Swiss-Prot record:
The gene is pdxT. The keyword Transferase does not apply. It comes from Clostridium kluyveri (strain ATCC 8527 / DSM 555 / NBRC 12016 / NCIMB 10680 / K1). Catalyzes the hydrolysis of glutamine to glutamate and ammonia as part of the biosynthesis of pyridoxal 5'-phosphate. The resulting ammonia molecule is channeled to the active site of PdxS. Belongs to the glutaminase PdxT/SNO family. One of its GO terms (cellular component) is cytosol. In the presence of PdxS, forms a dodecamer of heterodimers. Only shows activity in the heterodimer. Its EC number is 4.3.3.6, 3.5.1.2. The active site is at 78 (nucleophile), 170 (charge relay system), 172 (charge relay system). One of its GO terms (biological process) is pyridoxal phosphate biosynthetic process. Pathway: Cofactor biosynthesis; pyridoxal 5'-phosphate biosynthesis. One of its GO terms (molecular function) is pyridoxal 5'-phosphate synthase (glutamine hydrolysing) activity. This is Pyridoxal 5'-phosphate synthase subunit PdxT.
Length: 188
């Protein structure tokens, strides 16, 4: 199984290590041609405005959007979630628009407000999962067909719609492989 990781910035290496530890083949994605021959793609954290601009500058935005809409399993973490969202609060800019959610950027504050949390997410694991939030967004609107997987303090921080998984937090920054296992199971 070949799993693409959008490789502009963010936790690229950490996602690659988790993919390798699950015996899948990671593929760094830096242009639209590398979107071929992958079984799924991860859009990591980073800075969503920069990543969105790079998707446009490399002519990847529309080809990636088309592949996702045709069923390519896709997971967006933090900034990746923002890129996938239909809309972003207090912004007239959105990017891939493939999941019916509205997100609030930096919803938990600045870098200094980053935090760690553990919780049970039954769809993902039977054990508590460590969650790392860094300048994290959360979902402020969830479309009727989008399933909430996890909420913290009343805010949705993980959701799924068909082939698309989104998380506000960074599973790649922990040793826990639960979310990566779950995502890979959708790529088969």
């Amino acid at each position: 199984m070949r799993i693409g990781v959008l490789s502009f910035q963010g936790g690229v290496i950490e996602h690659i290590h988790h993919i390798e530890s699950l015996k899948a083949i990671p593929v760094e994605i830096k242009n639209k041609y590398e979107l071929n021959n992958i079984d799924g793609i991860i859009l990591p954290g980073g800075e969503s405005t920069t990543m969105g601009k790079l998707l446009m500058d490399t002519d990847m935005l529309e080809p990636l959007r088309e592949k996702i809409l045709k069923g390519l399993p896709t997971w967006g973490t933090c900034a990746g979630m923002i890129l996938l969202a239909n809309s972003i609060e207090n912004s007239n800019k959105s990017y891939l628009k493939v999941i019916d959610i509205k997100v609030r950027r930096n919803a938990y504050g600045s870098q200094i407000d980053s935090f760690y949390y553990e919780t049970l997410i039954p769809d993902i694991s039977s054990s508590k999962i460590p969650l790392v939030f860094i300048r994290a967004p959360f979902i402020t609107y969830l479309g009727s067909n989008v399933k909430s997987l996890c909420s913290i303090k009343g805010n949705v921080v993980a959701a799924r719609y068909k082939n698309i998984l989104v998380t506000s937090f960074h599973p790649e920054l922990t040793d826990d492989l639960s979310f990566h296992k779950y995502f890979l199971s959708t790529c088969r």
